Regions:
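Walker A (P-loop) ATP-phosphate-binding motif of ABC ATPase nucleotide-binding domains
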Residues: 2
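Hydrophobic anchor at the beta1->P-loop junction of P-loop NTPases
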Residues: 5
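The conserved Walker
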Residues: 9
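Walker A/P-loop
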Residues: 14
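Conserved substrate/cofactor phosphate-moiety recognition/catalytic segment
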Residues: 17-59
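Short loop/helix-cap segments at secondary-structure boundaries that form the rim of catalytic
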Residues: 71-78, 117-121
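Conserved phosphate-donor/acceptor-positioning beta-strand/loop module used by diverse small-molecule
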Residues: 74-97
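Small-molecule kinase domains that catalyze NTP-dependent phosphoryl transfer to phosphate-bearing small molecules
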Residues: 96-141
């Protein structure tokens, strides 16, 4: 099974992946992790697309996506989860990640990107108050 968890920075994609992985025992990739597969970036991308395609009906893979450019890597048949959070929650989490300091340019970037996946077609849309049992049920686990 291929599960794509898509969302802005600091919405909880990794936390959700960790919770799901208790049942899935999946290989987890995030963003450009696939570049580690090969020295040549285009060869790495091709290899990663093959891994994702094989995962649709094979070994479990969870792919965490923040950047829209990575959506094109997803094959048909992926179970797509869009994860959202309120802007104030995202800012607080990002501030914590930045050791208590959220520079104004980063804050403006978060504001401009907020809601970028709100209208994206998906199999399951969650906010940060999801119930993991309901999520696993939707996945058929």
């Amino acid at each position: 099974m291929l599960v794509a968890i898509i969302g802005e920075n600091c919405v909880g994609k990794t936390t959700l992946a960790n919770k799901l992985n208790g049942k899935l025992q999946a290989k987890v990739y995030a963003g450009k992790d696939y570049l580690r597969l090969e020295k040549n970036p285009s060869v790495a991308e091709t290899a990663f697309k093959a891994i994702l395609k094989d995962a649709v009906d094979g070994q479990n893979v969870i792919y965490l996506i923040t950047e829209k450019e990575h959506l094109q890597l997803l094959p048909e048949g992926a179970f797509v989860i869009v994860l959202t959070a309120q802007l104030d929650v995202i800012k607080a989490r990002f501030k914590e990640r930045m050791r208590g300091n959220l520079p104004l340019p980063l804050e403006k970037m978060l504001e401009s990107r907020h809601g970028m996946y709100d209208d994206m077609p998906c199999d399951l849309k969650l906010d940060n108050n999801y119930n993991i049992e309901e999520v696993t049920k939707k996945l058929g686990l």
